[in-house]
Amino acid sequence: MNEDLKYRKAEPADAERIMEIIRQAQAQMRALGNLQWQDGYPARADIDNDIARGYGYVFEKSGTAEEPAAAGTPQKCDKGRASGAVIAYGAVVFDGEPAYGAIDGAWLTGGDYVVLHRLAVADGEKGRGVAAEFMRRTEALARERGVSSFRVDTNFDNRYMLRMLERLGFAYCGKIVYGSGERLAFEKPFEA
């Protein structure tokens, strides 16, 4: 599934499309009564910082154009990249997460880990397994780098993420305080 998705580092030219996807996710969460991401987070500065630090990753759907140009309108040039639409975004962090040092509970491992923050999928791609595939590709990258586990946190009312974490084999480890509130923390250890 999803062989046509290229998992790559985000570039500054992707930032506006990423923010469009973030705004779509914020609207969906609001419509579902999910309180996460309703306070202006993540902002453009967060995404720009992710990209500058090398944390930002996207899924680019091969061979599709983002928007067809109207008749007589010049096509956008994308610095030599093959045409493709960015359909998902996440911040993939290998530097640790300071908030994870004070967990009300216990992590399953004590070694290096990868963290995924700000995972969002474009409206037209939801329900097709894109988020789960993004998580699997992030896990594969982490395994290549030799880290011992994959950690993630989410809001208590983010039902979609909670179900996906369970399906992907993550274990609930406790609660952490991150940003504006308490989050549920999960970990998936990698076998040696």
Language-model-derived ranges and their functions:
Residues 121, 127-140, 163-167:
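Conserved acetyl-CoA-binding loop-helix of GNAT-fold acetyltransferases
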Residues 79, 83-85, 91-118, 126:
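Conserved acyl-donor/pantetheine-binding loop and adjacent beta-alpha core of acyl/acetyltransferases
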Residues 19, 26-46:
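Conserved GNAT-fold acetyl-CoA-binding loop/helix
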Residues 6-20:
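A short beta-loop-alpha structural element at the N-terminal edge
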Residues 132, 144, 156-174:
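Conserved active-site alpha-helix within GNAT-family acetyltransferase domains
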Residues 135, 142-154:
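Conserved GNAT acetyl-CoA-binding A-motif
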Residues 108-110, 167, 175-192:
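C-terminal "cap" of GNAT-fold acetyltransferases
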Residues 53-69, 75-94:
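Conserved beta-hairpin
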